Amino acid sequence: MREYHIYKIREDVALDYYGMETKLFQLFQENREAKGRLKEATEKQIQYIIQQVNKVEIQDHLNKYLRETEGYIMRDNKHYIMSPKRNSQAGLCIYKMHIKLFSEGSQDSEACFFEALRNYDGTFIAMDFSREQYGWLKPLKSLEIAELSESNKAFK
């Protein structure tokens, strides 16, 4: 089973750390293993760079975005996509400071959740600590380029 912890990173931090996802992952990984003062220090750093997740907004967005997806259900404020034909299933839970995604089988169901979250906000980063995999759900360079082109329009 794959398990992803998904965090909403402050936009200024996300732009500064584009291409340096490894540093963010190392901070979160170190926090998971740390004790004592190191745990406190890494916890403060993490609290500074992440933003609270708006549970109600994301619930609504997922319901609208995934409503037509085969095998999608929402039960007890948890979201599931089960696709036996594709040997794929995933579940998503939204917490105050992060989102947790579990999946088994092929990656089709988890990809649906990632796409829905990417569509909601461009500053999510997903981390699978057991497999040491991580990455932005949306390429931030496209976000940065869009912002630059918007600011250039103001000068025209």
Model-derived features: positions:
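Acidic (Asp/Glu-rich) sequence patches and key acidic residues
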Residues: 1-97, 108-115, 129-156
